Regions:
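Conserved C-terminal beta-signal and adjacent last beta-strands/turns
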Residues: 6-8, 19, 317, 321, ...
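Acidic, small-polar-rich N-terminal luminal/periplasmic segments of exported/outer-membrane proteins
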Residues: 21-153, 542
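Outer-membrane beta-barrel translocator/receptor signature
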Residues: 118-120, 131-209, 215-221, 269, ...
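Outer-membrane beta-barrel proteins
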Residues: 161-167, 189-216, 249-272, 313-329, ...
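Acidic/polar loop-and-plug regions of large Gram-negative outer-membrane beta-barrel proteins
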Residues: 191, 195, 210-278, 284, ...
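Structural signature of Gram-negative outer-membrane beta-barrels, strongest in the C-terminal barrel
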Residues: 214-216, 338-340, 345-350, 365, ...
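Membrane-embedded beta-barrel scaffold of Gram-negative outer-membrane proteins
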Residues: 276-278, 284-290, 294-300, 494, ...
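Gram-negative outer-membrane beta-barrel transporters
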Residues: 335, 439-443, 553-564, 569, ...
Length: 719
């Protein structure tokens, strides 16, 4: 049925366009807006045989976006996952990911909430495609294009804002001329985080100096260093009711954690350098080197089970990751009479050290305990929250040992659950041709060869009589080498210069060490078998794109995706949740740009059907229908008003017979006041109707409560 609807819409739209105008010309667009910078080489959106969304720095400010999840809410075909309250997590066309993030085309896969202060634009590519990015990206990816120093320009700006939750932020951006061939730019931000939930708070600091050096007319060097220091409360949400299969609204104000026990920190140092050299009129060489060092910790309590008679079964852990990566990428781009040829090489060397401690409750000598849900819960004293109505294992204790008034304490340093050291070495070679077959026909043809060698050393853990785990030597290091070839084909027909019809086929893969490289075998295993071969995804897409003379851009796409190689796997970390044999099909419609001089629109709609060919039940975290609308009316030169709406259909949290996230509609509003050319005041009212909604959940009893109504006032000054 979806195929029929899509093809009908495509035929009707195309016919109407031809009837309206047969000789339209492409209007010029602002810098970056009409190109996808994550692609090599950058190409106009019209000539990309793939669905994508581009959000510029101005879009981010207008809509008051503060993090990646805000952008996703207004992006069709993509929805957010909870990320356990400490990381960006996105579901790209049914595939959950915590690692498919890039900065200037370079992998950025550590788990954290990314800031937007130094972003020129964000590019969201949908559909698995390993050709240009390698492993991962099985459902899509997000690339942030950074602000860089600009030669020959001097400018500076200040952006600051506060909101009714009590949060605030300041960002500064300054570019200066060092001499005729050198420029320096500095971006800095400080955020104080707050929201509608008790105890939530946080701070983010980011500093990003960049330098551009024009060595000669044909050679440019860009240098960048970024420091990030983040800390925030971790909120895992509320439980669901087994009878109603829905979140318990009466608990929407209860936080199952405390500031001391639920927290995450991140410290990162990222150094990047790139060289661009035009060695001829038709040849260009790009070399980039990135070295980074991340220190990430998160610890949290969460509800692992709940019934009204029992109470809330609390569980938790503390997880520490230390990761260092060196990424070297080299590409050579040559233009010919009939197209462009890109040859690229990439080398990645990553060292990852991780350990995880379970929570340890003194009363149960285990990692779980039962408490009665109340506001301002306390997990370290006998405060009436501890209950003897237990149905779980009590670590050798009897019910008589556990009384209503018993004292308990919890710690994160007594019970070691796992520890591993991982080394990943990736060598990649790719080739892509953008070929003009005829005046109206273009083809993209290419492939990528990846060799991924993963060595993991799992440490032995022994549990003593008190239920505490400790190191007990090391298991033998296990090495898995995967060699894969990933093809890509795109065929584009352009009936006129500002219009394209396309077909594309691509593949992507995910090694079985997972996104975060912690393990690819069960703890008891000492060898690696073919069972742990990479998961492979196939993606096909049929689409239509049209840039109208008025400034509007229309895109229609019908897509299918299939997980062709997969085996059941659970690494026990709570981070890797895989759908086995996932099959999706759906369509997407977007309409963006200027309606006329005074009105602009950003509309997107996606419908996705998802099934599992292996196992039973519906695929989780995949709402069948999502749509968003952002409409801006420029009433006068000084005043503009915008209205936004987002809708997300109901979706299964885990399995078809389990709890559901209910559908919801959220309304937003913004007013922009421009008293002068260099001053802008914005007032954003988020969740205008104060809707109670639940955007995502990590598991059955960890449902996030959407933000209540919030008013944000921001001010931008250009100097």
């Amino acid at each position: 049925m979806k195929k029929i609807v899509f093809l009908f819409a495509l035929v009707v739209t195309t016919s109407a366009i031809y009837a309206q105008d047969e000789t339209l010309e492409v209007k010029g667009k602002v810098l970056y807006k009409d190109q996808v910078n994550s692609l090599k080489p950058p190409v106009p959106i019209l000539n990309v045989p793939q669905s994508l969304s581009v959000i510029t720095d101005e879009d981010i400010k207008l809509q008051g976006f503060r993090q990646i999840g805000d952008l996703i809410r207004y992006t069709p075909g993509v929805n957010t996952s909870q990320g356990e309250g400490h990381r960006d997590a996105v579901v790209f066309r049914g595939v959950r990911s915590t690692a498919d993030f890039y900065q200037d085309g370079v992998r950025d896969d550590v788990q954290y909430y990314r800031s937007l202060y130094n972003v020129e634009q964000v590019e969201i590519l949908k559909g698995g495609d390993a050709l240009l990015f390698g492993r991962g990206g099985t459902g899509g990816l997000i690339n942030r294009v950074s602000k860089t120093a600009q030669i020959g320009e001097t400018f500076s700006s200040l952006d600051t804002g506060i909101d009714s939750f009590g949060g605030g932020d300041v960002a500064m951006d300054g570019n200066m001329i060092v001499n005729d061939n050198v420029a320096f730019r500095l971006n800095v931000h400080v955020d104080s985080l707050a929201n509608h939930r008790d105890m939530f708070s946080g701070d983010r600091v980011g500093v990003n100096p960049t330098m551009k050096i024009q060595v000669d007319p044909a050679t440019t060097i860009d240098l960048s260093y970024e420091y990030a220091d983040h800390e925030r409360f971790v909120d895992r949400g509320i439980p669901t009711d087994d009878a109603t299969k829905s979140p318990i609204e009466a608990m929407k104000d209860i936080v199952f954690g405390t500031k001391d026990l639920n927290t995450t920190t991140l410290e990162a140092n990222i150094l990047k350098g790139s060289l661009n050299h035009n060695y001829s009129d038709t040849g260009k060489l790009n070399l980039s080197v990135t070295a980074n060092d991340f220190r990430k910790m998160y610890q949290n309590l969460y509800v692992s089970d709940y019934t009204a008679s029992m109470g809330a079964k609390m569980d938790g852990y503390r997880d520490v990751t230390m990761r260092e990566s060196l990424i070297i990428a080299l590409s050579n781009i040559n233009e010919f009479d009939r197209g462009t040829l890109t040859v690229g090489f990439e080398m990645v060397d990553t060292e990852n050290n991780n350990h995880r401690y379970n929570t340890y409750f003194s009363s149960t000598r285990d990692d779980n305990e039962i408490f009665m849900p109340v506001r301002n819960m306390n997990f370290n004293v006998a405060n009436g929250n501890l209950t003897n109505r237990r149905t779980l294992e009590t670590g050798g204790l009897t019910d008589a040992d556990v009384t209503q008034d018993q004292v308990t304490y919890v710690d994160y340093i007594s019970d070691l659950n796992n520890q591993s050291d991982t080394d990943i070495e990736v060598t990649s070679l790719y080739l892509q041709g953008n070929i003009d077959l005829a005046d109206q026909w273009k083809m993209i043809l290419g492939g990528r060869y990846d060799e991924v060698e993963t060595t993991i050393k799992q440490y032995g853990i022994t549990v003593d009589g008190t239920g505490k785990g400790a190191l007990n030597g090391t298991n033998p290091s296990l090495t898995k080498k995967d060699s894969l070839f990933s093809p890509r084909l795109g065929l584009i027909f352009k009936p006129q210069e500002n219009m394209s019809l396309y077909f594309s086929y691509s593949e992507a893969f995910q090694p079985r060490s997972g996104e975060q490289y912690k393990t690819f075998v069960d703890k008891a295993k000492t060898t690696v078998s073919s069972k742990y071969n990479p998961d492979v995804f196939e993606n096909t897409e049929l689409g239509f794109k049209y840039d109208m003379d008025s400034g509007l851009s229309l895109a229609l796409a019908y897509f299918t995706g299939e997980q062709t190689k997969a085996t059941a796997f659970d690494n026990g970390t709570g981070e890797e949740t895989r759908e086995i044999g996932l099959e999706i099909d759906g369509f997407e419609i977007t309409l963006n740009g200027q309606v006329n001089d005074n009105n602009a629109i950003r509309f997107g709609l996606a419908s996705v059907d998802a099934t599992k060919s292996k196992g039973s039940g519906a695929a989780k975290e995949i709402p069948e229908l999502t749509y968003s609308l952002w409409y801006t009316h420029q009433a006068t030169d000084m005043f503009a008003i915008s209205f936004g709406a987002t809708y997300q259909d109901e979706s299964y949290i885990n399995a078809e017979s389990g709890p559901l996230l209910p559908d919801y509609t959220r309304l937003d509003m913004a007013m922009t006041i421009t008293p002068s050319e260099n001053d802008v005041v914005r007032i954003n009212i988020e969740n205008l109707g104060d809707e109670t909604y639940y955007p995502h959940s990590h598991s059955d009893h960890q449902v996030s409560v959407g933000e209540s109504q919030n008013v944000r006032v921001s001010y931008s000054k250009r100097f």
